[in-house]
A protein has these predicted regions:
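Short, exposed "boundary/linker" segments that immediately precede the start
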Residues: 1-3
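Flexible, compositionally biased loop and terminal segments
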Residues: 5-11, 15-231
């Protein structure tokens, strides 16, 4: 399976349980959930797992919240990458790295190099990611090739566009899981999710666990994927 999950509900976790806790409490709980979901994905024979951790729109949140989220990301990279490597997990990041701090980019690059040859599971974090930006960036790449006379515009096809995307290294998602009861795509992998199956669950991301992932996969397995055909 190729599974993508939108990590929604960290802030709702705080609103629902205690108004006295800091906003970042839910994000910390959500970060802990990543470890649980990664382990569950391996147990359930998932080959590719993409987690939508920080969108391009999230930069518009309060500055102190963004700083705390970046601190959590640093902590995750420091604490978890070695463990991911030992478990045979390949680590990838997609998104606009130019907006990330230099030390974070260096840690990401180091983690990707360390785990490059692993094959147990490919874990991708979408950070500073936006589906529209990803599509426009791919279009710019192809447009530049046309401008340099390296490409005939009449030769451009879907597969060529796929190869221009930064997600070209893994297949389109079979299943997209949206937590917290939200029923929208939130600018996530707009091109790649054309024929994905969606499962919407009420569970908040910090509470997401093995049984939730298993239930979503079971629901997906019972569906008839037609990819636009009538059969």
């Amino acid at each position: 399976y190729e599974i993508s999950a939108c990590l929604v509900g960290s802030e709702m976790c705080i609103r629902d349980r205690s108004r006295g806790l800091p906003r970042t409490y839910g994000h910390k709980k959500g970060a802990e959930t990543v470890r649980i979901v990664v382990e569950s994905a391996i147990e359930l024979d998932v080959e590719y797992l993409t987690l939508f951790g920080f969108s391009s729109e999230n930069w518009n949140r309060p500055k102190d919240e963004v700083i705390d989220l970046m601190s959590l990301l640093r902590g995750y990279l420091v604490k978890e990458v070695e463990a991911l490597d030992k478990k045979g997990i390949k680590f990838r990041v997609v998104g606009d790295r130019q907006r990330l701090d230099c030390d974070i980019v260096e840690m990401i690059t180091s983690a990707e190099k360390l785990t490059a040859d692993n094959a147990e599971l490919t874990l991708t974090l979408a950070l500073s990611y936006g589906g529209r930006r990803a599509i426009s960036d791919a279009a710019k790449k192809l447009a530049m090739q046309v401008y340099k006379r390296q490409l005939n515009p009449n030769e451009i096809c879907e597969e060529m566009f796929n190869q221009a995307l930064e997600t070209k290294m893994f297949p389109d998602p079979d299943l997209v899981i949206r937590t917290s009861g939200e029923k929208r795509i939130s600018n996530f992998m707009l091109w790649e999710c054309a024929y994905s199956e969606f499962v919407f669950i009420d569970t908040l991301w910090p509470d997401f666990c093995h049984k939730d992932l298993s239930a979503a996969i079971n629901e997906y397995s019972g569906r008839n994927r037609r990819f636009g055909s009538s059969i």
